[in-house]
Structures are given as structure tokens and as C-alpha cells.
């Protein structure tokens, strides 16, 4: 059997991108927008397999059923892994259905979290997550009430600072994690810097760099799940399972703090699932979820989405009422640079 494997730059090769999307849809899958490159397999001038890479995640992997059992899956995965390594991406993840886990195990992937029979998260290392948790454990602090916040801060607002202040005042120590993925309006580097500036003067807080084990909803692949509600549920289950069973025990976290969410139904539903999944009895110690009411200014809750809208309007007076000086300065400089390049 003569197979031809080809690399496709999805952002440049529109005809092949459309062909891959059609092939995936024939198999009840879809090609997600963040996919950068793909490997396709052709047999007798017919597309019979594909796999794509987005950041450090392998996804959109499918094989024509008529050729399953011919070793095509392993060939495709091997080529996809070679591409990832050439791009300098050695720490890889993939999400798939549990029924496919054995296939990927044969290519060197291990399961690290699972949402029932619907989704499993795998990575190409048996020890990497354990090593990361050992590194986290070096930042343990003494105390009976150890808190955590996971923050996107897109961008950092006075509401974020208030949440950190309140949580820190209620704990013996607070661990603050930043969502790492660059799937927000502002880069991870900029968001981390604004948080670092914004929490100046708040005691008993450790700011942790972003981690691939804090799963962003924006980058969670749902190409193999048909309904949006199922995608959201699987994301929260996998993300919160990793937090409760691996990250939190490393730091002996007992409480997780969130702000109330009056504006975004998606985040509000996530907070509800968080309470259910973190507080339920289980093998790992339960974590109490503490929901703090958002502060309000000028007739509405202080939120990053509100700041982004005011930023687009260049309403600096209104922005200044909602963000610390560091965020305001950053946004004004960003607006100036955008104006100069326009």
C-alpha cells in the first residue's frame, strides 16, 4: 500500500484546508480555526487521513474507516510528532475520546485527566505532570487555610485587585495562577506583567507563571464533540479534575476564590460546575469554593469585558475608573502604537 504524506500550511493553503474540513465533516469532526499546520495522507489521489497541530496540542486526527488496521494511524501520528518537534514543540497534548486512547498510547501518550466516556486529555510524557507538581510543592506555605485564584485578567482591573485583596485577607496564604494561553485580546506576557504590577502591596500571595495544566476554555478542542454544552462540560471536568487531584494537593490548597459573574453565562456556568466538582466527596481532598460579589463602579460591575469595550471607544476617563495605573498606562501606550501603525 503506497501512501503519500504531505504537510499543509493551513493558514496559506485554502483549497487543502477546505478539503481537510470536508474530510473531517464526513467523519463527524471539524477543523478548528486555531489549527496552524496539518499532515494529510493520500492514497490513490484520495484524502484518507489527517492530523493537525495548534500550539502544543495535536488535534483533528481522523482516518478513513476503510483503511483502519493498515498502520496508517501510527504513520500519520509519527509524521505529526516529527513536525511538532521540528517546530520546537516537544511538550505535547491531545484530547480525544477514551475509546481512542489505546491508539495514542501506542504513540507514546499517557492519559492525565478524563471526562467520563466523552473526552480524555493525554500528554507525551509519563512523568511531566508529576515533575511539575513536585516543583509546585516547593512553594508550599504553612497554614490551615490556603487559597487559590486562577485568573485570566484580560486585562487586569480594580475588580481583580479587590478579589485578590479579599482572598488574601481570608487566608493564611494565597496562590495566584495566570491562564497561559495567548487566546485573549492581550498576550500572556502582558497580562502576567499587569497582574504582577497590580497586586503590589498585597501580602501573603505567590504569583505563579502560567501552566499547560490550567486548561483554557478558549483553546479546549471540541472538534470530536457535537454539542457546545458537552464541550463546555468536558472542559470544566478535565480542567477541574487536574486542579483538584494534582495541582491543589501539591500546594495543600483548601479554598478556591472566584468573583460572581453577572454578565457572562458561560463563566457563571463554569463557576457552578466548579462548586459541584471541587466540593464533592472523592479520593482527593475537597476544596471549598468561595464566591465573592464583584465590586461596582459607575453603575455596573467592574469587568475586563467592560474595560475592553471602553478601550475600543478610547474612553480613557471611564477606563481610569476601572483599572489600576499600570493597566491604564499600558492601554494608552498600546492605543498610541496602534494609531501609529494604522
UniProtKB/Swiss-Prot annotation:
EC numbers on record: 6.2.1.22
Keyword Nucleotide-binding: yes
Residues of the N-acetyltransferase domain: 1-127
Keywords, ordered alphabetically: ATP-binding, Ligase, Nucleotide-binding
UniProt catalytic activity: holo-[citrate lyase ACP] + acetate + ATP = acetyl-[citrate lyase ACP] + AMP + diphosphate
Organism superkingdom: Bacteria
Class of this enzyme: ligase
InterPro entries in the cross-refs: Acyl_CoA_acyltransferase (IPR016181), Citrate_lyase_ligase (IPR005216), Citrate_lyase_ligase_C (IPR013166), Cyt_trans-like (IPR004821), GNAT_dom (IPR000182), Rossmann-like_a/b/a_fold (IPR014729)
Gene Ontology MF terms in the entry: [citrate (pro-3S)-lyase] ligase activity; acyltransferase activity, transferring groups other than amino-acyl groups; ATP binding
GO BP terms: biosynthetic process
Cross-referenced Pfam families: Acetyltransf_1, Citrate_ly_lig
NCBIfam families in UniProt: cit_ly_ligase, cyt_tran_rel
The protein's role, per its UniProt record: Acetylation of prosthetic group (2-(5''-phosphoribosyl)-3'-dephosphocoenzyme-A) of the gamma subunit of citrate lyase.
The name this protein goes by in its record: [Citrate [pro-3S]-lyase] ligase
Recorded name of the encoding gene: citC
Amino acid at each position: 500500500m503506497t501512501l503519500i504524506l504531505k504537510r499543509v500550511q493551513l493558514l496559506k493553503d485554502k483549497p487543502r484546508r477546505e478539503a481537510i474540513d470536508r474530510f473531517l465533516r464526513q467523519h463527524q469532526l471539524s477543523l478548528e480555526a486555531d489549527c496552524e499546520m496539518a499532515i494529510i495522507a493520500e492514497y490513490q489521489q484520495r484524502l484518507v487521513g489527517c492530523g493537525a497541530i495548534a500550539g502544543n496540542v495535536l488535534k483533528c486526527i481522523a482516518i478513513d474507516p476503510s483503511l483502519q488496521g493498515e498502520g496508517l494511524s501510527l504513520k500519520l501520528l509519527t509524521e505529526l510528532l516529527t513536525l511538532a518537534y521540528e517546530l520546537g514543540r516537544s511538550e505535547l497534548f491531545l484530547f480525544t475520546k477514551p475509546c481512542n486512547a489505546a491508539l495514542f498510547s501506542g504513540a507514546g501518550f499517557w492519559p492525565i485527566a478524563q471526562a467520563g466516556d466523552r473526552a480524555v486529555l493525554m500528554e507525551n510524557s509519563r512523568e511531566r505532570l508529576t515533575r511539575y507538581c513536585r516543583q509546585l510543592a516547593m512553594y508550599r506555605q504553612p497554614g490551615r487555610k490556603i487559597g487559590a485564584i486562577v485568573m485570566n485578567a484580560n486585562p487586569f482591573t480594580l475588580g481583580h485587585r479587590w478579589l485578590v485583596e479579599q482572598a488574601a485577607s481570608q487566608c493564611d496564604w494565597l496562590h495566584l495562577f495566570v491562564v497561559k494561553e495567548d487566546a485573549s485580546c492581550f498576550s500572556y506576557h502582558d497580562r502576567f506583567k499587569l497582574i504582577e504590577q497590580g497586586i503590589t502591596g498585597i501580602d501573603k500571595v505567590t504569583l505563579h507563571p502560567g501552566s499547560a495544566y490550567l486548561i483554557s476554555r478558549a483553546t479546549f478542542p471540541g472538534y470530536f464533540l457535537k454539542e457546545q454544552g458537552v464541550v463546555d462540560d468536558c472542559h470544566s471536568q478535565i480542567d477541574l479534575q487536574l486542579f483538584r487531584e494534582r495541582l491543589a494537593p501539591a500546594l495543600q490548597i483548601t479554598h478556591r476564590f472566584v468573583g460572581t459573574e453577572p454578565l457572562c453565562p458561560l463563566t457563571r456556568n463554569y463557576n457552578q460546575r466548579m462548586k459541584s466538582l471541587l466540593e464533592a466527596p472523592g479520593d482527593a481532598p475537597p476544596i471549598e469554593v468561595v464566591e465573592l460579589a464583584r465590586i461596582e463602579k459607575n453603575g455596573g460591575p467592574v469587568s475586563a469585558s467592560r474595560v475592553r469595550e471602553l478601550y475600543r471607544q478610547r474612553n480613557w476617563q471611564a477606563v481610569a475608573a476601572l483599572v489600576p495605573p499600570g493597566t491604564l498606562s499600558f492601554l494608552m501606550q498600546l492605543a498610541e502604537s496602534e494609531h501609529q501603525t494604522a
